[in-house]
């Protein structure tokens, strides 16, 4: 499925609270906390963490979770949108390890080191978070922008074909210009493992003066060409530049992500 959009939003399938028969309290903005940094044995560095929690949490209820990368730049934007759209979702923000020129971010968002970053998220970060907070482990989203948007695409392809760790994927103007031939081959390799690819995947392209739209379109095309079953692939394109496209599109992205 492909959509070209300039703005707007659609109804959300996650909350809002007034859609639940059991709600007794009106929606309240979520709680935002800075957590201690977590160290990784897979990547050898530590990552500062943030978390957003639904304010009126209900006992014995679990909530969808979004693992959002680049949290030092994107966390507040996404959390603000969750509040605006009255969504009961847990948001885990993973900040970057800061080195010169953010080289760690660049290297670990690309193949093959993306495998180690994915191992950190799925085997170290998520167990740490999900033993402390009421996460619905069958409704996980991974979200990234630029280089980490590329990483989101790689996660889609490297995840377990039978029991994927993530069920939803959001890539904002991903840097799919990096190793294009390899990425195309990874799509083909994943298709060879099986036709089923269980995900709702949203690809956002920025077609302003500065943006990765040409390469986001390529990745969308490769996925369409592979003809995966169970892949709900949504392409959204905006007349925006590379950085502003996240804030411009996030409302539509989140409501599309959780629509029925």
Locations of regions flagged by a protein language model:
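Serine-hydrolase catalytic machinery in alpha/beta-hydrolase-like enzymes
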Residues: 62-134
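Solvent-exposed loop/turn segments at secondary-structure junctions
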Residues: 71-75, 96-100, 147-150, 175-178, ...
